[in-house]
């Protein structure tokens, strides 16, 4: 996926405005996600527990250049009837709350203890920040959703979502160099959402 952001809380030199001219920070990013295992699949092996295996995926968010919103994650999801549960480990912005007190990958090497930002490492746009991936503080995130079936008195399929946010919006890299107003801390890491399912490609939501 490709995305482009305009961050008003970060300044950037604007030479067309003359000496000292500034504009808001413009930043593009790329994200990747790969599914490692499919829910209920044992890939040719016949084990009784196969039906209980979850989807497992690994992802990189804003993985190149300045990496202001960079995150990496490993996540699993499993459906039980109308419920769908998700839980994962996140690094970077997703790991900024440090809610497990360290990085489990540090048992392999202490290089995973520290994480630099794209700015601090001097990375240019489009250059993958491999030296930062899966490093630094780590946090657990997760959520659950429930599908509300269509009924005579309720003529749409919809979902209720509950999410635990592992991003510290004051400490995440995209705000460490903020100028002026900073992001306010959240009253709660718990978010609630509601989605109407129009078809398999289109949902409308309120969060």
Q: Where do the PLM segments sit?
A:
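Residues that define the transmembrane beta-barrel architecture of outer-membrane proteins
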Residues: 24-30, 52, 68-72, 136-142, ...
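Outer-membrane beta-barrel transmembrane domain signature
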Residues: 84-193, 197
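Transmembrane beta-barrel domains of Gram-negative outer membranes and organellar outer membranes
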Residues: 1-64, 80, 93, 148-158, ...
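Short, intrinsically disordered, charge-balanced linker/junction segments flanking boundaries
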Residues: 200-207
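Hydrophobic, well-structured mid-protein blocks that either form specific transmembrane helices
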Residues: 60-91
